[in-house]
Amino acid sequence: FLSIDLAHALALPLYDPDSQVMVNGKPQYEVVDPSKPNSASSRQRPAMGSGLIGGSGVVLGAIDAKVIVAANGGSDLIYVPSQDGALVRKLIQWLATQDYVGGIFADSSFGHIPGALSLATVGLEGAAVTPRPSIIVAFKTFASDPQNPLQSAVQIADTTLQEGQGMHGSFGRDNTYNNMAAIGPDFKKGFVDVAPVSNADIASTLAYLLQLPVSSHGHFAGRVLEEALAGGPDRVPFQHHQIGSSKTASPPRATFLEYQSTAGRSYYDRACFAEPASRDVSEVQAGHAPASCSR
């Protein structure tokens, strides 16, 4: 749905990168037009949710789309091939007005943008040679039962799956608070780890137990879960953090991020996009969110 909404907001044509048709003997990405019935040359919705916005829709040669939306379930990736900072800011200003947005993150090369935290804030800027999204937008999550939020979570998702079929990829706590269990002679018995743990820690811990010399090939993003190992410490120190972007002008909204840290590594809990009316805006503008994302 996001590609449809963005194309409408920008008044640009929308093409489906996952569906092609022949036009005058040449392959063309199929036109997406929700206002018209499906036909031999156009469709109402992208097949997989992704979209090429603007340009000619020609398949062969360089893609000339102004904006590319990669649908990703609970979050979508937005690429601006021209690296046009003014366009990126325009997109974020528009996203900030949508009630389904749960957080906005932008490439730090575009500088400070009200309403958005940088991709670097969540560890998504590195040395990879693959294209980096200009913007990542997380969709809103909420609980149908506030007394049991993890088991009653609802998330908005840009996907072809139907309601009840399940989805992930959002930045809600129901997505990031997964469980992990380890059994074996190297692990403590009946131990419950209260420190933050992520999937990235599995490889580091297994490499340590198997004494694999991985340091010669680089380094892992995760840590060794020493507190869970037999003979390890009872606990490791960790901290909770909250940060927020500066607010947009109208409506006044900001992206807030909650995360934990230990051993120099960050573990991201959740993000939300909210009006900071009840918050100290000066703290938000300084990069600190004085309240949680609990909803």
What are these regions (language model features)?
Residues 75-106, 185, 194-230:
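Non-catalytic, well-ordered alpha-helical segments in soluble enzyme domains
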Residues 102-135, 194, 211-246:
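Polar, surface-exposed loop/tail segments
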Residues 76, 144-146, 169, 176, ...:
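Solvent-exposed soluble domains appended to multi-pass membrane proteins
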Residues 1-163, 276, 283-294:
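Secreted, luminal/periplasmic, and some membrane-associated catalytic domains
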Residues 70-75, 181-187:
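Short acidic (Asp/Glu) and glycine-rich catalytic loops that position anionic groups and cofactors
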Residues 233-295:
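Phosphate/adenylate-binding glycine loop and adjacent helical scaffold
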